Design a protein with these regions (language model features):
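Short, surface-exposed loop/helix-turn segments at secondary-structure junctions
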Residues: 158, 165-177
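Short, solvent-exposed aromatic-acidic interface loops
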Residues: 198-209
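Alpha-helical scaffolding within the catalytic cores
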Residues: 40-54, 86-88, 143
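Short acidic, glycine/proline-rich loop/turn micro-motifs
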Residues: 68-69, 110-114, 168-171
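Active-site environment of divalent metal-dependent phosphoester hydrolases
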Residues: 2-6, 10, 32-39, 71-74, ...
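Active-site-proximal beta-strand elements of phosphoester/diester hydrolases
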Residues: 60-70, 99-102, 154-160, 197-199
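Core catalytic region of metal-dependent phosphoesterases/phosphodiesterases
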Residues: 1-48, 132
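His/acidic metal-ligating clusters that form di-metal
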Residues: 20, 75-157, 186, 194, ...
Length: 246
């Protein structure tokens, strides 16, 4: 939470080898606990105090990271200069469209009114830039809980957190960070669709399931056989799953 220099060093040591094993591009996005000077120096080997806005191309899918942070504050803003830059980038569509990555999600927070004080300010200015563009989705964080909405007609997906999450049911607290429900979001990009999956992290207890080896059995079947085996409630395959789990 303090944007300490050593945290960026350790972050690269953890993330970059994992990304290399997956042949994945790492895209960093500034958050309200980051400090621009250390962020740019230790993650990008650059000396800068400017907003950390960047453009990436992943096989024709454009990903734009926009720095919504305000130095010294927790709420978010996008300056007029940043908006002009973003409008210029979006003036030319990408082959597979664009994903916009920001920290502060441009959506309401009805279950936590306090977070409204820390939201992205002047959202109408960003909406004016995005309307009619090729932006297919907006990816965000900041809230420490998962939620979804739309903004300027664009789907918005907010990832929770891998540290602490906010308890949306804590009526006797202004905000309550808890050690529970941590997760990551995985986004699958198709030609005409985005699929957002919330994947819990940490220990869980299985209450129902099939062994991994069952997939080989299903793969060998025809489409019709798969329906009769996996979809039919009374099939021996499903009966075995029910009996083996109680």
């Amino acid at each position: 939470d303090l944007g300490e220099p050593d945290a960026y060093v350790r972050l690269r040591e953890l993330v970059e080898p994992a990304a290399a094993r997956m042949n994945a591009q790492v895209i960093w996005v500034m958050g309200n606990h980051d400090e621009r000077s250390d962020y740019s120096r230790l993650l990008f080997d650059e000396e800068s105090h400017a907003p950390q806005d960047r453009v990436y191309d992943i096989n024709g899918l454009r990903i734009i990271s926009v720095d919504t942070t305000v130095p010294g504050y927790h709420h978010g803003e996008v300056t007029d200069d940043q908006l002009d830059w973003l409008a210029d980038v979006l003036s030319s569509p990408a082959p597979h469209g664009t994903l916009l990555a920001v920290h502060h999600p441009p959506i309401p927070t009805p279950l936590l009114e306090a977070m409204g004080m820390l939201e992205l300010f002047d959202q109408h200015k960003l909406a004016a830039v995005l309307e009619g563009s090729d932006v297919r989705g907006i990816l965000a964080g900041h809230l420490h809980y998962s939620t979804h909405s739309t903004f300027a007609g664009i789907p918005v997906s907010v990832a929770s957190a891998t540290c602490y999450t906010l308890d949306l049911s804590a009526e006797d607290r202004l905000l309550s960070g808890v050690d529970f429900g941590q997760s990551v979001n995985i986004v699958h990009v198709y030609d005409k669709q985005l699929v957002h999956s919330i994947v819990p992290i940490g220990a869980t207890t299985e209450v129902s399931g099939f062994p991994a080896g069952a997939w080989a059995q299903i793969e060998a079947m025809t489409p019709e056989e798969r329906i009769e085996t996996f979809s039919k409630k009374s099939s021996s395959f499903n009966s075995a799953e029910v009996s083996s789990n109680g």
